């Protein structure tokens, strides 16, 4: 797991990287798998296989999404808290588009926005949907919007 510890970020003050090993937790009387390499498929949509990575994973040289795609993921979801800085929005957009092109998949990027509670950084909520290198939908920065796109 990737934790940022550079520039404005210092996540390692509060968190430590988790184990890459798979495990389970008890929830609602059921064993629920947990881990960094889970893939979710849909019985009703043959080619739909979804994987997730977290924020910093996209920004490192070898993101978990590479292994997810090699294992069959067709959609990668990234849950993020990426702040705003001059030029960062276009760089973030290029990262998402590039990753979707490189992995030949859809890449959904959802970042913190309006209502984020931290006082040290500003979060603009730039949410993106890209497929095979093309950005299909993008929210306006500092607007509370829902993005929708058809992924083929």
Report the location of each language-model feature.
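Enzyme catalytic cores with a strong preference for nitrogen-chemistry domains
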Residues: 1-152
